Amino acid sequence: MKKNLSSTIVLNKIPEQFYRPRTAVDRSEITRCEKITTEIFPKVEEGAKLIANTIEAEIKAAQTAGRECVLGLGTGQSLTPVFEELIRRHEEGLSFANVVVFNAYEYFPLKVGSKNSSLHKLHELFLDKVDIKACNIFSPDGTIGQDNVQAHCRTYEQKIADKGGLDIIVLGIGRMGNIATNEPGSTLTSTSRIILTDAISREEMTMSFGSQEPVPPCTLTMGVATILKAKKIFLTAWGDEKASIIEKTVEGPITDTIPATFLQTHNDATVVIDLAAAAKLTRIVRPWLVTNCEWTDKLTRSAVVWLCLKTGKPILKLTNKDYNDNGLSELLALYGSGYNVNIKIFNDLQHTITGWPGGKPNADDTYRPERANPFPKRVIVFSPHPDDDVISMGGTIRRLVQQGHDVHIAYETSGNIAVGDEEVTRFMHFINGFNQLFINNSDETIKKMYADIKTFLAAKKPGDMDTAAIRTIKGLIRRGEARTACTFNGIPLDHVHFLDLPFYESGKIEKLPMGERDVNIVRDLLLQIKPQQIFVAGDLADPHGTHRKCTDAVLAALDLEKEDKAAWLKDCRVWMYRGAWAEWEIENIEMCVPMSPEELRAKRNSILKHSSQMESAPFLGNDERLFWQRSEDRNHDTAKLYHDLGLACYEAMEAFVEYVP
């Protein structure tokens, strides 16, 4: 069973020479915009091996010379593949007996013995699985008294110096360009110190904690100057959620608002990333500016859209001069003229727009994104949480229902962890009041549960896991909201399916691994309905990873059906939606469904049915907008982009990309 098929989704096939240049001359050409040595790999494991190779070589060189190898290590998620590779090498015989490790940062203040310390996590991930001596492990002490912090940081700095400085330091990067926990505003000369973490950093750290326990407000961190004294620096990042900050770090100016840019001043710093994290580097996203290109349809569309945005012109007004002045003369040679390129791309984009997301019956579908037949279609919309369906494609769902298709909504997880305690209190007050008013307070189960839950919530401390009963009630609240939204959109309640995939039910932010039980639940639904059209979440960068695991479960089930040569699958198309956390890039859009002002208002109303996910929802991310506002803004932006390119002007649009099993 293939459990990570989402990682194989490649929207744009990047030519190998863009990330693995054949010669030094080629590398010099394609990296001309990059100010730090950057190594890009198609797979995370390959990048981890590069770092592990360097560390292994340094360890062995130190062993030969009879000295210690001094490492600085962070504990971000991006370092986990590196630790796994080093552990594998240890199991094959690599000794870490001569290795000294300095932890890059620690939370402050901490209680003695806290299992949420950065050092505890480093032990779990790496130190306890290799033969590093306990006396060779150093870390800032998060339990130290506040009056002694400055002296402690100076001592930590001196310990690094006494060991001869760091031979290699391996760090991740925060969304704001943090290295270790040096926040925006950190100076080039800063040394080990206490620092107040901002809200975005604390949110990232909360995910590492694996619970809702508040992250301590401060950290004790190596300073920028401390890091830059290392002989060799590795900065790692994986996944498209890091693409923007990597582009600013590697290609942008040095600025204290992005501390990672200080690495540009080091003579042996290397950024190690995968293709997803490299997605916004010039050589990947705008290769025509640095080298010759093989002009695929998608790359041509991307270049023309970029040219329109740069010149402020719609597609059909671009001239030969525009192409020549902006490094796109190759397209003129390929197509004969700018006019020919313009017509092709305009038509390509025009053909993505459809008011018939399920296909228009009895119509020529040659240039339509979805086929006309069969009609009506059996449709399943898979929604990771009980509101992702309406947030991401609420307008399309209403259109499918209104046009007569047999629409089913499958809510993959309970979403219970995203319900606030006050919602439970409100519903328990209602149930208790109902018991008193209508059944003479005679239901002893209700009375006991009301008392137990009231007592538990009153005594609940940050980080305490909800009881099974409370999680069930929170799940019921979300089920009720989902049913209300489905009814509003015209979907019969017997077409609403709550899958409650087991991987989600950890009771914590950190979920269980997606497994065979999850896949079988999805597969059973597919075999029951045998859909001719499927919609799945392509919004794989959600903060807690639920979307990716849910989509992986669907793709794994489809893959099993494909292996079994299921007849129904031959007549089925799979579409990926986004909207809750991101939107599709226009070069990848294959179907775009427009909405009128009235339809957009109906979509908003369907999102608002999920009342527990409004202002009081625990996990709104670092975006201050509510989900309906984010959704509308993205839909407005997509419509505006189409209009700016010279296509029809709509109020809003929802975009989709096809997945081929």
Features from the language model and the residues they span:
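Ligand-binding beta-strand-loop-alpha-helix segment within the catalytic cores
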Residues: 22-35, 94-168
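Class I SAM-dependent methyltransferase SAM-binding "motif I" and its flanking Rossmann-like core
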Residues: 180-224
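Short, surface-exposed, charged loop/turn segments at secondary-structure junctions
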Residues: 175-197, 250-253, 548-557, 590-595
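N-terminal glycine-/serine-/threonine-rich phosphate-binding loop
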Residues: 2-70, 365-366, 373
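ATP/nucleoside-binding phosphotransfer catalytic cores, i.e., glycine-rich phosphate-binding loops
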Residues: 2-12, 25, 30, 225, ...
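Histidine-anchored nucleotide/phosphate-binding helix
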Residues: 82-92, 390-414, 418
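Glycine-rich N-terminal segment of FAD-binding domains in flavoprotein oxidoreductases
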Residues: 63-92
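Metal-dependent de-N-acetylase/amidase catalytic core
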Residues: 202-210, 214-219, 311-380, 399-403, ...
